[in-house]
């Protein structure tokens, strides 16, 4: 029994290489480096630099102001979400009478196009 184990132990590398009919790409898997190389990322890009910028509003302002009230942008878009058609309709309702003629016509054209598009294609039908 001991001699059989010694034979198998001594010829282990021959047995394992002899029974494989395909290559693993490397002779010894223990020598391979499995640690990935670290990514070179910019830690101060725009997204990371402004992360949590409005977190102190509640602490310093006694929780009276919501961050959406501090965001500067068009009045018809503040604190509101929606697709392009809904956004254009909302803009026409809020500032349509005060728009220049050409801008209002271009907005109406865009609304007509999007209305047809949303009713013909996509999951909105």
Swiss-Prot record:
Component of the mitochondrial ribosome large subunit (39S) which comprises a 16S rRNA and about 50 distinct proteins. The keyword GTP-binding does not apply. It comes from the Eukaryota. This is Large ribosomal subunit protein mL51. It is found in: Mitochondrion. Keywords: Mitochondrion, Ribonucleoprotein, Ribosomal protein, Transit peptide. InterPro entries: Ribosomal_mL51. Belongs to the mitochondrion-specific ribosomal protein mL51 family. GO terms for molecular function: structural constituent of ribosome. GO terms for biological process: translation. The lineage of its organism: Eukaryota, Metazoa, Chordata, Craniata, Vertebrata. Pfam families: MRP-L51 (PF10244). Residues 1-29 form a transit peptide. Its main location: mitochondrion. The keyword Isomerase does not apply. GO terms for cellular component: mitochondrial large ribosomal subunit. It comes from Xenopus tropicalis.
